[in-house]
Structures are given as structure tokens and as C-alpha cells.
Amino acid sequence: MKDLLQALVFGGLFLIPLLPLYVENDFFFPFITGKNFAFRIIVEVVFASWILLALSDVKYRPKFSWILPTFGGLLVVMFFANLLGEYPLKSFWSNFERMDGYVTLVHVFLYTVVLGSVLTTQKLWSYFLHTSVAAALLVALYGLGQQTGVFEGGRDRVDSRLGNAAYMAVYMLFHIFFVAFLALRSKTNVHRVAYAIVGLVLVYTLLQTGTRGT
């Protein structure tokens, strides 16, 4: 049972960074709804599995960090702000075009709690960042494929599997910093060269979005 719970928790945590590659063409907003529904479902499975795992093994229980009470305070403030807003229902649930309401924020909080409780070593965080960077590289290469006509869309402004050039720019910007962080911590020239190549691909892709991610 414990092995199954560990597989669900770690598998789900490392599956989330791959979601930018997922597009659900059967939905009305294929670039938004598919990713968000998948994110919510995965987080709920991961969180439920983590609760059971933490009850049976103390090492998976959360350690104190100011990030969690700060994030929790934000949730409380946002709850009352949404409740007292002009459109509380939309504030809580958002819509299918954006899907960024309070429900999504709660799921992000749950994901953060599990990440902080389970990824407790530098090696695990390194694996996680490398997974995210690998996904970003695939997203970038797909976007460059759009420019060359290999894939549809994004000929003028690269949007890749995100469907929005502005979102693509922000996504690239974050991962440029992730790559820089990994390069600075690298101890071999081979790895530094590899990170530099990946970083250049991401920077070039960022420029091809036509925006700067701000």
C-alpha cells in the first residue's frame, strides 16, 4: 500500500510539469480547459494519497515554512475578496476560457503543500527542475516547428502548445531562470554547455513570441 501511495504522489508531482504539452482538442478551449482539468484531477489524487502517506510515515509530514502560512493567508484574503465581489460565483469558479478562479488557487496551494513536504532533498528538487526544463525545451522546439511550417499555427508569434504567445513568453522566461540556476550549480563543463544550449533555445523562442513575458 505504501509503495502505491508513493508512486501516486511522486508520479503526480512529476507529471504536472509535463502538462504544458497536453492539448485537449475535443474541448471548446483546447489549450486551457484540458490542462486545468488534468491539473485539478492530478492534484486531488496526489493530495489524497499524500494524506494517507503522511499518516503512516512521519517523514512525509510537512515541515514549518513561512511560505505555507503566507500562502494560507492569501487564500483567506482571496476567499473574502471573492465572496464580497460583484460576481462571487465567477470569482470562485472562473470560466472555461481562463479557469483561474479561487478553485484553481486552492489546487495550487495543495500542490505546493505536497511539493514542500515530499521533495525534501536537493536531488529530488534537481530531478523536478530538470523535468520541468525538459518539458519547456519540448514546448520550445514545437514552437520553432510552427515557425518552420512543421506544425500548424504560431507562424507570426510562437504560441506552441500553450495557444497564447503571452503565456508562452512567461513560461519561457521562468525556465530561462531555471536553466541559469541549474547551470550555476553545475560542476562540470559538459553540463554547463548543455544548459547554455538549452538556455539559448529558450531565449530565442521567447523572442519569437513577440512579447517579453511581462
Per-segment meaning from a language model:
Residues 173-175, 180-182, 203:
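Internal metal/ion-chelating core segments
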Residues 150, 172, 192-195:
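A generic short alpha-helical patch detector that favors 3-5-residue windows
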Residues 6, 206-209, 213:
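Short strand->helix junction
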Residues 33-40, 97-105, 159-175, 210-213:
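Membrane-interface micro-motifs in multi-pass membrane enzymes
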Residues 86-91, 105, 144, 169:
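Hydrophobic positions within alpha-helical membrane elements
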Residues 75-85, 114, 123-154, 162, ...:
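Hydrophobic alpha-helical transmembrane segments
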